């Protein structure tokens, strides 16, 4: 039976002789023109350790597709290194790259009439970018994570890249000398793979496994281990079977499977960025999802894993302890997972997890027993109030002071804030406000890992609050609130805060409040004027024009023809 469900448009009939001529030049033989043509979206790049091992994985995917009787075609997609661009103008392009990746995969798959696609990515925006495209085009697809980095080691401690960011704050506070700073820098990132804690890349890969769009155990494998390459080849074979059975992404990415993914994000203590990305993925899949849904799930799912940034362990430790299947089985047994959701394997979640123990091994403490979780409820809270009428996102577990009321220290950019922290101008009890860093205002909604790490390094993590219309790295922890919406650039209340204003962040009440009267807020709003755009040409200008609020995922295709 012919398996070229879509590619027959470019391979069949007399009129397609020129098309076949070009395909012959890239290795097609007569027998290949009735096979499924499978794209391999290759995120290989030496820009970042996250992606530098992906080329070998793409080759294994190619081998798996050939073995399964289909025809592979490799194409490239881009990446930005969040870690390297952090704290610079370059970080404005990070969230933008999510859209570029999505658009590029959609463009190639539809432009070349591919029958399916295996997307291989590493750095943070590779995952949501690929899944947005997969949900849009709705052809058989599977996602392969490039793999996590192994921890670095120094002075008896495991290190991640966040250790280096925090060392900057420690050095500026006089807690370590330059030799110690350099030692951490030299040992933090020992090889290939994405940042090792439960930061954004590992959060999204774990969520995609829970979603059913990646193979079991694949999300926590180390990039440099043989099992990662073996899993990639197996993923390719599974995809070819999905093409034969026409198992489509929108049969897998449903409201219930997205709830499963969010539940796992809560259970592993994942990144705030997952909120933004799943809002966008849901939209691409035609699934209704809003911020309140995250809060509902947060209230019923415990944090089961002791993982960095706020915990002790990294993703490779989670893998040894049973990986995401162990976490999922615990949630399933306690009625917090939809077991009837389909996966890319052709089996349901319940079938995939059938042989997994109901409780984790007692010989490890990465995954806690159900009756002794890290926290009884999830950590990603949605805060609302007069400073964030559409909502804001915060990590609320593990903070020693769940309520902070203090004077506002207002900064118009991340750089100005970082300079003030390193100069010792921020004191215990202050509430830092970094604004005009939102999707439109940045533009690009930069991550604030540099200032938050500097706060931690300076010993102020438990006594200083930080709010922003920008984002936070998955490596961030402390009393920090991001994704404040509406953002400053569109006249949100964060634009109206004045130096010294009293602000309250209340994690218990999940509120974010500027402590001034409604009359004063109205007066300030009447006097507010929008700022001229920072960019008038190029991709940042286009992005600022098109991007929607963070409260709906900062997508760029919302109500396009009403703008």
From Swiss-Prot:
The modification N6-carboxylysine is found at residue 125. Its cofactor is [2Fe-2S] cluster; Mg(2+). One of its GO terms (biological process) is L-valine biosynthetic process. Gene3D superfamilies: IlvD/EDD C-terminal domain-like. Keywords: 2Fe-2S, Amino-acid biosynthesis, Branched-chain amino acid biosynthesis, Iron, Iron-sulfur, Lyase, Magnesium, Metal-binding. Mg(2+) binds at residues 82, 124-125, 447. InterPro entries: DHAD_IlvD/Edd, Dihydro-acid_dehy_C, DihydroxyA_deHydtase, DiOHA_6PGluconate_deHydtase_CS, ILV_EDD_C, ILV_EDD_N, IlvD/EDD_N. The active site is at residue 473. It catalyses: (2R)-2,3-dihydroxy-3-methylbutanoate = 3-methyl-2-oxobutanoate + H2O; (2R,3R)-2,3-dihydroxy-3-methylpentanoate = (S)-3-methyl-2-oxopentanoate + H2O. PANTHER family: DIHYDROXY-ACID DEHYDRATASE DAD, DIHYDROXY-ACID DEHYDRATASE, MITOCHONDRIAL. NCBIfam families: ilvD, PRK00911.1. Homodimer. Functions in the biosynthesis of branched-chain amino acids. Catalyzes the dehydration of (2R,3R)-2,3-dihydroxy-3-methylpentanoate (2,3-dihydroxy-3-methylvalerate) into 2-oxo-3-methylpentanoate (2-oxo-3-methylvalerate) and of (2R)-2,3-dihydroxy-3-methylbutanoate (2,3-dihydroxyisovalerate) into 2-oxo-3-methylbutanoate (2-oxoisovalerate), the penultimate precursor to L-isoleucine and L-valine, respectively. This is Dihydroxy-acid dehydratase.
């Amino acid at each position: 039976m012919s398996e070229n469900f879509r590619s027959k448009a470019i391979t069949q009939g007399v009129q397609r002789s020129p098309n076949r001529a070009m395909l012959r030049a890239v290795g097609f033989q007569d027998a290949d023109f009735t096979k499924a043509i499978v794209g391999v979206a290759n995120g290989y790049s030496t820009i970042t350790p996250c992606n530098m091992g992906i080329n070998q994985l793409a080759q294994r995917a190619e081998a798996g597709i050939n073995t399964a009787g289909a025809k592979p075609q490799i194409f490239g997609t881009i990446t930005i290194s969040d870690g390297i661009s952090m704290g610079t103008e370059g970080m404005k392009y990070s969230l933008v790259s999510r859209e570029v990746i999505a658009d590029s995969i959609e463009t190639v798959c539809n432009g070349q009439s591919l029958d399916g696609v295996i997307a291989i990515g590493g750095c943070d925006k590779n995952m949501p970018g690929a899944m947005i495209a997969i949900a849009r085009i709705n052809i058989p697809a599977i996602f392969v994570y490039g793999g996590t980095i192994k921890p670095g080691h120094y002075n008896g401690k495991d290190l991640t890249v966040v250790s280096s960011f925090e060392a900057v704050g420690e050095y500026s506070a006089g807690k370590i000398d330059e030799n110690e700073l350099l030692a951490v820098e030299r040992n933090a990132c020992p090889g290939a793979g994405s940042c090792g804690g439960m930061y954004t890349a590992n959060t999204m890969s774990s969520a995609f496994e829970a979603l059913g769009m990646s193979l079991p155990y694949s999300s926590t494998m180390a990039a440099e281990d043989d099992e990662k390459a073996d899993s990639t080849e197996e993923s390719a074979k599974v995809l070819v079977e999905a093409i034969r059975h026409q198992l489509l992404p929108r049969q897998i990415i449903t409201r219930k499977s997205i709830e499963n993914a969010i539940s796992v994000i809560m259970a592993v203590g994942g990144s705030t960025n997952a909120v933004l990305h799943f809002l966008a993925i849901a939209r691409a899949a035609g699934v209704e999802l809003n911020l309140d849904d995250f809060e509902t799930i947060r209230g019923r799912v415990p944090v089961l894993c002791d993982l960095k940034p706020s915990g002790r362990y990294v993703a490779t430790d989670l893998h040894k302890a049973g990986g995401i299947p162990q976490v999922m089985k615990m949630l399933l047994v306690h009625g917090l997972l939809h077991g009837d959701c389909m996966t890319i394997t052709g089996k349901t979640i319940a079938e995939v997890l059938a042989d997994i123990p109901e409780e984790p091994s007692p010989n490890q403490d990465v995954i806690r027993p159900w009756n002794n979780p890290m926290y009884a409820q999830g950590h990603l809270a949605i805060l609302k109030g007069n400073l964030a009428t559409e909502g804001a996102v915060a990590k609320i577990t593990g903070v020693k002071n769940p309520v902070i009321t203090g004077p506002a220290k207002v900064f118009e950019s991340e750089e100005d804030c970082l300079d003030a922290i390193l100069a010792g101008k921020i004191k215990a009890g202050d509430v830092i406000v970094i604004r005009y860093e939102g999707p439109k205002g940045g533009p690009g909604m930069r991550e604030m890992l540099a200032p938050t790490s500097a706060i931690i390094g300076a010993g102020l993590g438990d006594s200083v609050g930080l709010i922003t219309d920008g984002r936070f790295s998955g490596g961030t922890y402390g009393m920090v609130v991001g994704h404040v919406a509406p953002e400053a650039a569109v006249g949100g209340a964060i634009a109206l805060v004045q130096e010294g204003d009293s602000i309250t962040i209340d994690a218990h009440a999940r509120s974010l409040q500027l402590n001034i009267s409604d009359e004063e807020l109205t007066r300030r709003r009447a006097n507010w004027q929008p700022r001229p755009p920072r960019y008038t040409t190029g991709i940042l200008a286009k992005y600022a024009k098109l991007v929607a609020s963070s409260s709906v995922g900062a997508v760029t295709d919302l109500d396009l023809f009403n703008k």
